A protein has these predicted regions:
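Rossmann-like NAD(P)(H) cofactor-binding subdomain of soluble oxidoreductases
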Residues: 64-152, 170
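Short acidic low-complexity segments
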Residues: 59-74, 348-355
Length: 457
């Protein structure tokens, strides 16, 4: 890719405009799209954005209402629309997006109906025509307020892609003296943090609205990242992501800044304003939008998330903000540090990733009635293909085999195909399987999701 990159930005909100200016400053050719002709006309004429005081949009940043103009022939296509508009935007832009396109998503959220992250939604929508199997998706996330980026205040962010070379390409495009960009291959972890931290930030805001101080704020932030981590490890994310910019970094800035709509909304709720009215006053509150998906994920993966659960109860009107604080403070006593089996099993994958490996979710299928030396060797080699290994167990009388498999350090999850209500392809989508490892002679399952790669050992 040349130093001067052509970039199309889908979305003309504060983040899209702030990034358009930053990318133009880096010497790139930038075109911004909005579905509103009136907004495009105003941006083109005034070269200002009311929500970003002091920002002047360069004359050579182009504006358009035409999807073909913004999407065709671009080196990078950036999705900067709200999370609820990602699927519709991807569907509309699909005819103009070539296969192999680098797509960067900056929206944060989980789609409630499918429990997909934003890059997964984009891939799912683009793949429906069977002609977009090789798009390169990047999640760009971290502690980034558009208001500060627009004023060239120092900021750091994460470029996450399963292909490190693509992550580094995006890193180079965004990096400058005011924007330091890091890379990560744990895309799911980065996106999960971006969605879940909004809920935890709501809790911090509610606490502040109740008049609580810094002690409570610090406790909620710390325990908030702990419960996000518990969920992420169950989903196969890398543990270190939660202690990084996309995890604790983004949570801190969202939970403490008045730039944050989640924090401001929480403060209003804590002060007694009904949740619906608080949202009306503040605008889009992604933390409230993320609650239905968070509750489903918590139940599906059997993870304790007391803060998120309490926020959900307040938003639904089941308890008051004051009762939420009391309920959290009077929970049964527990230890701060619990040695999770998943954390132990993740250790080898973590070390490999730090040394340059790539984190992927891997699945094997079989009866594994006899855990012979050969079977264990096969499972170990399968785990080496990615880092997080799921065994899909076939046959009957699986309880003993399931326990034996989980006792192995190389196995992270065991699914009982006889009792699961979902089909194998549905389970692969649910658990975001990226690599299916087969032994010689095993047939490839029917209706394999297009995102799953097959590897024979």
């Amino acid at each position: 890719m040349n130093n001067r990159t052509t970039i199309g930005i889908l979305g003309s909100g504060t983040w899209g405009i702030a990034l358009a200016r930053l990318l133009h400053r880096n010497g790139h050719d930038v075109t911004v799209w909005s579905r509103s002709p009136k907004k495009i006309e105003n941006l083109s004429a005034t070269r200002t954005y009311p929500a970003l005081p002091g920002l002047v949009i360069p004359e050579t940043v182009h504006f358009t209402c035409d999807l073909q103009t913004v999407a065709s022939g671009k080196d990078i296509l950036l999705f900067a629309v709200p999370s609820i508009a990602i699927r519709q935007t991807a569907e509309s832009a699909r005819p103009f997006i070539p296969d192999g396109q680098i797509i960067v998503d900056v929206a944060k959220g989980i789609e409630p109906d499918t429990l997909m992250t934003m890059t997964e939604v984009i891939r799912d929508e683009l793949s429906k025509d069977g002609q977009h199997d090789h798009v390169k998706l990047v999640a760009l996330s971290g502690p980034t307020h558009a208001e500060e980026v627009a004023l060239d205040m120092p900021t750091s962010i994460v470029s996450a892609c399963t292909d490190m070379q693509v992550a580094e390409t995006v890193q180079d495009v965004f990096m400058n003296t005011c924007m330091r960009t890091y890379t990560n291959t744990d895309v799911l972890g980065v996106e999960l943090c971006g969605a879940m931290k909004n809920i935890e930030a709501l809790a911090v805001g509610i606490s502040s609205g109740l008049g609580n101080g810094d002690n409570a704020r610090a406790a909620l932030i710390t325990r908030g990242i702990a419960e996000i981590s518990r969920l992420g490890l169950k989903m196969g994310c890398a543990e270190y992501t939660f202690g990084g910019l996309a995890g604790i970094g983004d949570l801190i800035v969202t939970a403490t800044s008045m730039h944050s709509r989640n924090n401001r909304c929480g403060i209003l709720i804590g002060q007694g304003v009904p949740p619906q009215e608080a949202v009306r006053q503040v605008g889009t509150v992604e933390g409230i939008n993320a609650l239905p998906a968070a509750m489903q994920l918590m139940e599906r993966y059997q993870v304790e998330m007391p803060i998120a659960k309490a926020v959900n109860a307040v938003v639904k009107g089941e308890i008051s903000a004051k009762d939420m604080a009391l309920a959290l403070m009077t929970r049964d006593k527990t230890s701060e540090v619990r040695q999770s089996e998943l954390a132990v099993r993740f250790e080898s994958a973590l070390m490999r990733h730090i040394s340059g490996g790539i984190m992927r979710r891997v699945m094997v299928i079989g009866e594994f009635a006899d855990l012979s030396h050969e079977a264990i060797a096969f499972l170990t080699r399968a785990k080496d293909e990615g880092g997080h290994l799921t065994v899909a167990l076939t046959g009957c009388a699986q309880d003993v085999r399931k326990s034996s498999l989980l006792a192995l350090r190389c196995v992270d999850r065991v699914l009982d195909l006889e009792t699961e209500k979902l089909t194998l392809p549905e389970l692969m989508r649910l658990y975001r399987i990226e690599v299916l490892v087969l032994a010689e002679g095993q047939d490839v399952p029917e209706m394999l999701p297009p995102t799953v790669k097959v590897k024979y050992l």
